[in-house]
């Protein structure tokens, strides 16, 4: 008799994706973050569902409903902080996952990579809209500033902003639609993630060496299921430590003040995971230029396969490219720090230099370095 997991139409799909999946025997812990992102998404959907049961998307009651969740709902504060800090864990895993893809040349799987970039943009949009929902000062002003960027688009800009707002300012209509979008997008993300996985399983996983591992595959279960569970335990431990010891560490104190359109906070800034892009936006004095640079900072990922000039796929045996990669990581950390600083000397010039360096490394230095490495190896 054939095993049910190999014959049942539904079980067969699960089996081919998570049990009998042939996996390279040498993939490292950097390959754990895909499964961690799946766990983060499930956690966010579940905690978000319970929050939505008690939240009201009306400007007069939104802030109070969040306070009610924290004070009166059984373990509401745990659910709320799991959701807020779960988003931070989500982005930590996302950045590492993308970084791994860049380092080991995983972007050569074009379909998987392009769906991944779409996923990144969708998750960023979802997180931004979620940040608006508690209707604190930073929620309101963050929404106002970021949606206002659309007005930089020539000719249709102003109409576009008012269309997004549903009025002449960020108000009840904006909050209601942001709540609706914030609720539906995670399910779209789940669907996209399934497509992402589908494309990945067409080609099989990459591995640290960047060369074909067809002759050296092992089943996903039990080897990588155990490995993924260990990674998940570490992530959950980190998340619970954050939630139970310092839940407001990554938040903004201004968001504990109800939204007031008549009072602008001294420093408007988004959540920490958007600060690198925010720093690039602010480093250009021109509004349209800043918006284009902001978009380019993420969309540049789509160009990665075209910018790959090395004869080797992975950076494992390319020390010059490795140095550049870690300079890029340091540059992104610098941009994240700058994004949270006030717009004054010396932060302005540091931000501008870091922004130039970001694009310079990706568009110029990495391709040239790869060509030099090819020549050194006489390829």
Swiss-Prot record:
It is found in: Mitochondrion inner membrane. Heme b b566 binds at residues 97, 196. Its cofactor is heme b. Keywords: Electron transport, Heme, Iron, Membrane, Metal-binding, Mitochondrion, Mitochondrion inner membrane, Respiratory chain, Transmembrane, Transmembrane helix, Transport, Ubiquinone. SUPFAM superfamilies: a domain/subunit of cytochrome bc1 complex (Ubiquinol-cytochrome c reductase), Transmembrane di-heme cytochromes. The chain crosses the membrane at residues 33-53, 77-98, 113-133, 178-198, 226-246, 288-308, 320-340, 347-367. One of its GO terms (cellular component) is respiratory chain complex III. One of its GO terms (biological process) is mitochondrial electron transport, ubiquinol to cytochrome c. Binds 2 heme b groups non-covalently. One of its GO terms (molecular function) is ubiquinol-cytochrome-c reductase activity. A ubiquinone binds at residue 201. Heme b b562 binds at residues 83, 182. It comes from the Eukaryota. It is a multi-pass membrane protein. Component of the ubiquinol-cytochrome c reductase complex (complex III or cytochrome b-c1 complex) that is part of the mitochondrial respiratory chain. The b-c1 complex mediates electron transfer from ubiquinol to cytochrome c. Contributes to the generation of a proton gradient across the mitochondrial membrane that is then used for ATP synthesis. The cytochrome bc1 complex contains 11 subunits: 3 respiratory subunits (MT-CYB, CYC1 and UQCRFS1), 2 core proteins (UQCRC1 and UQCRC2) and 6 low-molecular weight proteins (UQCRH/QCR6, UQCRB/QCR7, UQCRQ/QCR8, UQCR10/QCR9, UQCR11/QCR10 and a cleavage product of UQCRFS1). This cytochrome bc1 complex then forms a dimer. Belongs to the cytochrome b family. Heme 1 (or BL or b562) is low-potential and absorbs at about 562 nm, and heme 2 (or BH or b566) is high-potential and absorbs at about 566 nm. This is Cytochrome b.
């Amino acid at each position: 008799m054939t095993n049910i997991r190999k014959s049942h139409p539904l079980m067969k799909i699960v089996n081919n994706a998570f049990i009998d999946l042939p996996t390279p025997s040498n993939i490292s812990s950097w390959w754990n973050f895909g499964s961690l992102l799946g766990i983060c998404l499930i956690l966010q959907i579940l905690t978000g569902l319970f929050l939505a049961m008690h939240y009201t998307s009306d400007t007069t009651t939104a802030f109070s409903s969040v306070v009610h969740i924290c004070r009166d709902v059984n373990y509401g504060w745990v659910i709320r902080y799991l959701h807020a800090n779960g988003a931070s864990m989500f982005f930590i895993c996302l950045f590492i996952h993308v970084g791994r893809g860049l380092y080991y040349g995983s972007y050569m799987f074009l379909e998987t990579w392009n769906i991944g970039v779409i996923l990144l943009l969708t998750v960023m949009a979802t997180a931004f809209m979620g940040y608006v929902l508690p209707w604190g000062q930073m929620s309101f002003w963050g929404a106002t500033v970021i949606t206002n960027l659309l007005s930089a688009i020539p000719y249709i800009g102003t109409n576009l902003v008012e269309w997004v707002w549903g009025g002449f300012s960020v108000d009840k209509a904006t909050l209601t639609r942001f709540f609706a979008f914030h609720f539906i997008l995670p399910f779209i993300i789940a669907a996209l993630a399934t497509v992402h996985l589908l494309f990945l399983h067409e080609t099989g996983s990459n591995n640290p060496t960047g060369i074909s591992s067809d002759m050296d595959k092992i089943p996903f279960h039990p080897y990588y299921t155990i490995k993924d569970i260990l990674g998940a335990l570490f992530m959950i431990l980190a998340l619970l430590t954050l939630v139970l010891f310092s839940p407001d560490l990554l938040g903004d104190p201004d968001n504990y003040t109800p939204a007031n359109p008549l009072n602008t906070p001294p420093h408007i800034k988004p959540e920490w995971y958007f600060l690198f892009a925010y720093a690039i936006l602010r480093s250009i004095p021109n509004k349209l230029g800043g918006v284009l640079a902001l978009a380019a900072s993420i969309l540049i990922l789509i160009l990665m396969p075209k910018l790959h000039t090395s004869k080797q796929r992975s950076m494992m045996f390319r020390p010059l490219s490795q140095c550049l990669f870690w300079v890029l990581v340091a540059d992104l950390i610098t941009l994240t720090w700058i994004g949270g600083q006030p717009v004054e000397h010396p932060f302005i010039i540091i931000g501008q230099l870091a922004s130039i360096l970001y694009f310079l490394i990706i568009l110029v230095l990495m391709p040239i370095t790869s060509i030099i490495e090819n020549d050194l190896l006489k390829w």
